[in-house]
Structure formats: C-alpha cells, structure tokens
C-alpha cells in the first residue's frame, strides 16, 4: 500500500511540475540600429491593450554595445504581449521630447510598429508567446 501511495505521489508531483514548466517561457528581445552606445535601454513588456505604453507588465534596463542590445525576460506565461523600448542616452530614466512632444531619443516597438501622428498602436505591436521566442526590433 505504501508503495502505491509513493508511486501516486511521485507521479502527481511529476505531472504538476511538468505543467508548470510548460506555461513559462523566455522572451529574448534583440534591438539593433541605435544611434550610439551612450546611456541604457529601457525595455518594457505589456500584456493588455489598455496599459500599452502606460503601465508595463515587466521591465528591464540593459546596456548597449556596438549600437545593439539584448533584453531577456524569463518565465513569462503564455499569452499576448507587446514590447517597447526607449534609448535613454542621458540616463535620466525617461524619454526626452522636444517642445512638440516628438521624441529626441531612439524608441521602438515589437513588430517594428510605428505610429502615424502619435505613438504606435497595441494591435500593431502585439504578438503571441506560446513558447520560447526571440524578436528583433530595428530602428
């Protein structure tokens, strides 16, 4: 009887652990074409249209080398996401804009989404994460 209980326990733990691992994925974001290696890159992930470019789901600040950068987000649940970044050249932790609100620093979004007379739209930047994934954003 003890043997049967132990087998059942180990089987349950194995199934439970496997399903937890199947639902957590890594997202690698490669960004290229930056103007310089100065400052840092602020990379944000969004998982809801209403929070896009307002409140990030997860964020990361990464270094820049040879006008490129890589940000890795681990253990993300399966779902719909969008990514944005700002090249914070002066490291003041915000996107600098001119008098008209036009960005002075590099920025971009997943799917290389661009806005017309305003910021990019979530629907243009969104993608599905159903496994480990690498996306490339070019300036």
Range-by-range predicted roles:
Residues 1-24:
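Bacterial Sec-dependent N-terminal signal peptides
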Residues 25-33:
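A short, amphipathic beta-strand motif
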Residues 36-51:
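Short, ordered, surface-exposed loop/turn motifs in non-cytosolic proteins
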Residues 62-67, 129:
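Short proline/glycine- and polar residue-rich coil/turn motifs
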Residues 67, 72, 77-80:
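A glycine-anchored, Pro-Gly-centered beta-turn/N-cap motif
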Residues 81-85:
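A short tyrosine-centered beta-strand micro-motif
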Residues 89-95:
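Acidic, glycine-anchored loop motifs typical of Ca2+
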Residues 105-139:
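Extracellular beta-sheet/turn segments enriched in Thr/Pro/Gly and aliphatic residues
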């Amino acid at each position: 009887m003890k043997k049967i209980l132990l087998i059942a326990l180990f089987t349950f733990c194995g199934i439970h652990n496997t399903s937890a691992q199947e639902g957590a994925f890594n997202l690698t974001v490669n960004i290229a074409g930056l103007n310089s290696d100065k400052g840092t890159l602020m990379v944000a992930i969004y998982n809801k249209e209403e929070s896009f470019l307002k409140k990030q789901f997860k964020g990361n600040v990464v270094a820049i080398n040879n006008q490129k950068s890589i940000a890795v987000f681990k253990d993300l649940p399966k779902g719909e996401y969008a990514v944005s970044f700002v090249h914070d050249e002066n490291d003041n932790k915000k996107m600098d804009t001119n008098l008209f609100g036009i960005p002075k620093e590099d920025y971009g979004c997943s799917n290389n989404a661009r806005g017309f007379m305003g910021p990019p739209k979530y629907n243009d930047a969104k993608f599905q994460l159903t496994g480990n994934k690498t996306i490339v954003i070019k300036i």
